[in-house]
Amino acid sequence: IGAAGVAFNTAAAENSDLATSRSLILVTPDGQRTMNTYLGISTDFNRAEVDPAVIEASNYVYLEGYLFDRDEAKAAFRQAVDIANKAGRQVALTLSDSFCVDRHRKEFLELIRSGIAILFANESEILSLYECGSFDEAVVHVSRDTKLAVLTRSEKGSVVVSEGGPIPVAPDAVQKVVDTTG
């Protein structure tokens, strides 16, 4: 990952009672998956861990929606977005989970509209974000809120939403789905 130019400049946490994050993924014979994730020490993300120099030296800053639960983390997200925007950097956000979106819809929308350039979401997450009944309606909304959105739709493929409009991406033909963990 480092050879591809991706940096993970995070020191190991010290003096915490929380364990390392874990994810248990169960895959059924039809390839569908169920995840049970324990975020552990990741939930302690806060403003002290946001390094302006690292953000200013980056091309992209990637924010993981799962970490948005605590107020300290929300403040860190906002700080990172502010630093990145002032430095002319691109900020990407993944919505992570429709339940996460349900918990933080208003704040996610505020964050997205404040300077998220790239949004990653699946169909259920984007429908939850905009509280609408159709995927096409959600595409209209997201096109107003961010420069680029990449929306996955399982067996229906994906849709890339940019200033030029939505671009459908057909799924690859697969003989047998082994695992849908993405």
PLM feature segments, named:
Residues A4-A7, K106-S128:
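Structural recognition of alpha->loop->beta junctions
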Residues P52-E56, I112-R113, S143:
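A short, aliphatic-rich alpha-helical micro-motif
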Residues E49, A75, V101-I112:
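Distinct, well-ordered alpha-helical segments
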Residues I1-L63:
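Conserved N-terminal subdomain of the carbohydrate kinase-like
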Residues A87-L95:
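Short beta-strand/loop segments at the ligand-binding rim of alpha/beta enzyme cores
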Residues Y66, S96-S98, S124, S154:
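Active-site beta-loop-alpha junctions enriched in small/polar residues
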Residues F8, V91-A92, A149:
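Hydrophobic beta-strand scaffold residues
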Residues D82-K86, K106, F135-G182:
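Conserved phosphate-binding/catalytic region of the ribokinase-like
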